[in-house]
Amino acid sequence: MTTAYKAGTDVTWRWGAHTARGRIEQVFTEPVARTIKGTEVRRNASPENPAYLVTQPRGGYALKSHSELEKDG
């Protein structure tokens, strides 16, 4: 079973040829949808693969699955 990250955890993920960074704001263990920059983003979250609403340093948001993220540092 996956150990979920907690709100406030700094994380990274691959974005094209780059690495993006952010901080977890909210944790979801059930399917979730959010509209980000006018696009509906969905994640099929579960206790085994939680989803996270992540804030980025420049103020943007991302909705990511646990399997997409790595703890920063």
Label each PLM-derived region with a short phrase:
Residues 1-4, 16:
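Short, surface-exposed secondary-structure edge patches
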Residues 19-27:
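Short beta-strand-centered aromatic/proline hotspots
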Residues 27-33:
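Short, conserved beta-turn/loop elements at beta-strand boundaries and strand-helix junctions
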Residues 43-73:
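Intrinsically disordered, low-complexity, charged/polar segments
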